[in-house]
């Protein structure tokens, strides 16, 4: 496993010279193996551990926090701990608990990394302990739910500052590493529950695949890499095509429609993404359809529309809503800034006032103040 992790890190340039590492450590076997490996002579990197107590499993969550803190003290590793009532935060934000927990974790990791980088001036990487098994399970989850080629690529080895040195190592290899090196770890009791979709895949689907072929995970890894390489190439072609088809803030529909279907769909997804619109497979197909028909509209969120007219594909947005200002004397603020000053005169006094202040008056109106608004 040491060799695999070292080759993975080198292939993806995970740890540049002089870098520091923020390691996300839950206390489970995967993250403990990663921490041990980062401190091992293979890497021998300066590491700061980050642990998040999500407060979701009562005493078990507190046990994990205490375990990580105690072990880091014994190993002489700096440790940062965050306690967060994720369930309450998820209700407040109106998002799922799992998604909320992920956002809290990565925000904590990134804040810690930013502080370390500012203090040291050295590059900082955030290491998380996803394994090949996690990657395969995620691919199967995406496949069952419905996804694109990008979704089948599953979890990337590296993205920005986030790196995954164990991404080519199976969970069995990690368990063997922990056993050989007597690495202590804790077990999350919820991992054994098939009430969670990912656990059903892990506990039921993947073992069946191994019965078909013991090398199923490695075969899946090769397939995911092939898909990733193809997707990156086709996405690059789509980016180039969009540059050629660009017409100011719009695009030439004919040029987009002439693209090969895999490139056209990726270009459509990129346009929808730039317009902050839904980019589901069905929406991408609808977008490609109006491009092919040379005219038509596609409803987007917020009352907006993608429209093709006279060979140009553009985004139509509803005009700013009208606003009213009551014609009462005084100063009235305008939406977006500015002001209007209203002053009324009777017919007799206005001509005399205009002579004195003629440079200040450009428009006037005769109106019934009880009916007219501007």
Language-model segments: residues:
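Mid-to-C-terminal catalytic subdomains of enzymes
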Residues: 181-218, 222-225, 356-371
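Core alpha/beta nucleotide-donor-binding catalytic domains of modification enzymes
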Residues: 1-207
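Generic structural signal for hydrophobic core residues of well-folded globular domains
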Residues: 143-144, 166, 209, 227, ...
């Amino acid at each position: 496993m040491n060799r695999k992790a070292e080759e993975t890190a080198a292939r993806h340039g995970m740890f540049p010279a002089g870098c520091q590492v923020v390691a996300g450590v839950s206390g489970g076997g995967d993250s403990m193996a990663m921490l041990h490996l980062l401190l091992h002579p293979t890497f021998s990197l300066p590491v700061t551990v980050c642990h998040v107590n999500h407060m979701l499993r009562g005493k078990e969550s507190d046990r994990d926090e205490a375990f990580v803190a105690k072990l880091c003290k014994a190993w002489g590793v700096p440790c940062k701990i965050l306690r967060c009532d994720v369930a309450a935060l998820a209700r407040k934000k109106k998002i799922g608990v799992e998604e909320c927990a992920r956002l809290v974790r990565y925000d904590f990791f990134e804040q810690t990394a930013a502080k370390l980088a500012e203090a040291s001036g050295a590059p900082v990487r955030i290491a998380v302990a996803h394994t090949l098994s996690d990657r395969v399970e995620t691919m199967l989850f995406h496949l069952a739910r419905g996804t694109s080629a990008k979704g089948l690529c599953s979890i990337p080895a590296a993205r920005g500052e986030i790196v995954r040195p164990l991404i080519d190592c199976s969970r069995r290899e990690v368990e063997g590493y922990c056993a050989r090196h007597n690495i202590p770890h804790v077990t999350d009791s919820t991992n054994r529950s098939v009430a969670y979709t990912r656990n059903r895949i892990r506990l039921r689907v993947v073992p069946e695949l191994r019965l078909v072929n013991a090398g199923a995970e490695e075969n899946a890894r090769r397939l995911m890499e092939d898909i990733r390489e193809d997707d990156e190439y086709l996405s690059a072609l789509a980016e180039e095509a969009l540059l050629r088809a660009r017409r100011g803030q719009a695009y030439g529909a004919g040029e987009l429609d002439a693209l090969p279907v895999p490139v056209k769909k990726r270009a459509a997804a990129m346009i929808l993404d730039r317009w902050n619109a839904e980019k589901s497979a069905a929406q991408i197909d609808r977008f490609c359809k109006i491009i092919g028909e040379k005219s038509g509209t596609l409803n987007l969120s917020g009352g907006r529309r993608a429209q093709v007219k006279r060979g140009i594909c553009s985004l139509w947005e509803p005009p700013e809503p009208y606003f009213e200002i009551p014609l009462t004397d005084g100063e009235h603020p305008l939406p977006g800034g500015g002001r209007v000053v209203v002053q009324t005169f009777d017919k007799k006094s206005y001509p005399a006032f205009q002579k004195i202040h003629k440079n200040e008056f450009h428009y006037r109106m005769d109106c019934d103040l009880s009916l007219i608004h501007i």
